[in-house]
Amino acid sequence: IKHCRQRFGVVLIDTPPSQSDLIAAAVDASSLVVLVTTPGPLDLDRMWETAKAIDRPSSVLLTQTRANTVALRDAERFLSDHGLARFDATIPFKEALRRSSESGRMPSASGYGLVANEPIEAFHGIE
């Protein structure tokens, strides 16, 4: 990771949600942790437990969102009430995005492009 950081300046590490050893190693190597969650109450509670356990700056990325819904407003309120930073953009729910793991193709309008610069800007703000 040090070599990559020297070469590229910023290194993003994506981990699967259920491999705690891998997640712990990635968090230990991180300057900024992106906590990814859906707006669902169970997912938010799980993410909150993770947020409390890490000792790094973090920001929450809401995925599978639907604009102008009670669920999204409740999730945003949850993050605010718990003092959690979040990305300005969210990743909208799209059926094609759900199926992308089967096809191996990411839809062009997935929404991830909207948040691409936010972690880099945040990273530079804490370094």
Model-identified regions with their sequence ranges:
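Structural beta-sheet core signal
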Residues: 13, 35, 60-62
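Short histidine/acidic/glycine/proline-rich micro-motifs that form metal-
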Residues: 41, 63-68
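Beta-strand-loop-alpha "switch" segments that mediate conformational coupling across diverse proteins
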Residues: 66, 76-108, 121
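Inter-motif core of Ras-like GTPase G domains
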Residues: 18-41
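Switch II (G3) loop of P-loop NTPases
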Residues: 1-23
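Short, well-ordered alpha-helix to beta-strand connector turns
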Residues: 8, 30-31, 83
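Histidine-centered active-site loop/cap adjacent to the catalytic His
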Residues: 108-127
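Anionic-ligand binding region
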Residues: 32-35, 42-58, 70-80
